[in-house]
């Protein structure tokens, strides 16, 4: 089964190569369709799938890897330049050390146009050098993997807490602008409580300051 997912992963992360091969094979497909007319609709699916792979291939690969892969851990050890440009962006590659479930360490890499993040999303944030994160990989092809950004790994936790802090800052700005707005007050309090419950604040003084803010808001004090 790993071989099938390996092929799917390769095709999904080689979108333009897949499309190029499909169009090269188009004359063959047309010829087969003429020769075997009753099977034409099946042959026609090939270029259609290659086109759809441009938009949904990485999502399918991410879900497949997470569903059928094994859980491991990884860290980024360095980056490198590539000669690829994607959407006016110079693609950057990253060197990775991946530790499998049985403790084996594998050297691998990925590029930031692979979109190998689970759950899939339109805009992705990748770990930096030295970050530790969770991956799902194929047992027989451990160099095929996706990065998990919504679990409790150190990197994913930092990412989640960073987003929460941004939300708290935005809610605070709204509340400070219009303190009489009940919606702004409740949103600000809810986000502070979420920030604290997610254990995103380590400093006891900062925790006390947030709780003091909540008490003041609920008491109607400035």
Which role does the model predict for each range below?
Residues 2-28, 48-222:
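Oxidizing extracytosolic/periplasmic lumen-facing domains
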Residues 33-42:
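Membrane-interface helix-boundary motifs at transmembrane edges
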Residues 43-47:
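Hydrophobic core segments of alpha-helical transmembrane domains in multi-pass membrane proteins
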């Amino acid at each position: 089964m790993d071989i099938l997912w390996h092929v799917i992963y390769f095709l999904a992360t080689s979108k333009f190569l897949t499309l190029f091969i499909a169009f090269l094979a188009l004359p063959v497909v047309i010829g087969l369709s003429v020769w075997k007319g009753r099977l034409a609709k099946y042959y026609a699916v090939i270029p259609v799938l290659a086109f759809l792979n441009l938009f949904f291939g990485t999502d399918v690969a991410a879900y497949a890897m997470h569903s059928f892969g094994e859980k491991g851990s990884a860290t980024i050890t360095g980056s490198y330049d590539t000669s690829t440009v994607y959407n006016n962006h110079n693609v950057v590659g990253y060197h990775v050390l991946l530790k499998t479930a049985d403790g084996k360490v594998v050297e691998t890499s990925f590029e930031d146009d692979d979109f190998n993040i689970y759950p899939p999303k339109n805009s992705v944030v990748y770990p930096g050098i030295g970050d530790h994160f969770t991956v799902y990989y194929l047992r027989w092809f451990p160099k095929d993997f996706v990065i998990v950004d919504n679990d409790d790994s150190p990197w994913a936790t930092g990412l989640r807490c960073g987003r929460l802090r941004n939300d708290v800052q935005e809610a605070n700005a709204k509340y400070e602008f219009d303190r009489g707005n009940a919606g702004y007050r409740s949103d600000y309090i809810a986000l502070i409580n979420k920030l604290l419950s997610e254990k995103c604040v380590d400093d006891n003084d900062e925790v006390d300051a947030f709780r003091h803010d909540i008490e003041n808001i609920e008491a109607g004090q400035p």
